[in-house]
């Protein structure tokens, strides 16, 4: 997740930074994005697989997206540095801020109000889910997907508005450069951490004791362990790996 806040600064960088670095970074972003489509864009992907050394060693074509994750923050830094240039440059900053705000907030609003026209929210396994749980479950699942898109689009919109407000306050001399950097940094941190914790949070960490000794032997396990002959056990319980942890199991 790159973050709406980082992309906002990146957009400012594209508008404000005039150096030659902007163009190769932008080209790298576009090329990496196209390559990440893989078999969905075969005319480009096949050229790279056949002619670019070691490109076919990637386990997944989406790995190329790390280039995007590198280039966009660099452009974001360029955008931030342009904001802190001398006073004569401020007029361009106001114009760029307005364009970035209207463009990115407009995209968020499109996702909020026209999502059902843009997406059908149908998953690859919806047919399988329907056979297992019924069509009502699938319809509820699609509504949840739609609600998640709305919530994230609204979340991104709020972060963009906060970022724009802080930068506007700096350009209007309401706050100084140090305070601006701190507030923008906190907004970026909140944006990234909020999404990252959906994937890695406190529930993903286990104590060393639980990792080293995930199961405790009960009396039956202790009794079986006394048998030194060659055998395998058959466990018809809940499919737990406990039996395989202590004994040679039929299931491996």
Question: Whereabouts are the PLM-identified features?
Answer:
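Conserved luminal/periplasmic juxtamembrane motif of membrane-embedded glycan-processing enzymes
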Residues: 1-252
């Amino acid at each position: 997740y790159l973050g709406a806040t980082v992309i906002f600064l990146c957009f400012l960088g594209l508008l404000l930074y005039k150096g030659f670095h902007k163009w190769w970074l932008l080209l790298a972003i576009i090329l990496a994005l196209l390559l990440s489509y893989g078999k969905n864009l075969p005319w480009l992907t096949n050229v790279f697989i056949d002619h670019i050394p070691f490109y076919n060693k990637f386990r997944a074509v989406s790995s190329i997206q790390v280039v995007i994750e590198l280039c966009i923050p660099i452009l974001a830094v360029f955008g931030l540095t342009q904001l802190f240039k001398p006073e004569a440059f401020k007029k361009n900053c106001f114009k760029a801020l307005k364009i970035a705000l209207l463009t990115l907030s407009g995209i968020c609003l499109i996702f909020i109000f026209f999502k059902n026209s843009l997406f059908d929210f149908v998953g690859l396994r919806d047919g399988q889910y329907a056979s297992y749980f019924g069509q009502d479950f699938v319809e509820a699942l699609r509504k949840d997907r739609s609600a998640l898109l709305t919530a994230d689009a609204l979340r991104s919109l709020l972060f963009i508005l906060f970022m724009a407000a802080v930068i506007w306050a700096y350009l209007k001399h309401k706050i100084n450069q140090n305070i601006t950097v701190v507030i923008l940094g906190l907004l970026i941190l909140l944006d990234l951490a909020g999404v990252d914790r959906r994937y890695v949070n406190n529930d993903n960490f286990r104590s060393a004791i639980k990792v080293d000794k995930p199961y405790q032997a009960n009396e039956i396990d202790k009794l079986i362990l006394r048998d030194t002959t060659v055998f395998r056990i058959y466990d018809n319980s809940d499919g737990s790996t406990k039996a395989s942890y202590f004994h040679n199991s039929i299931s491996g």
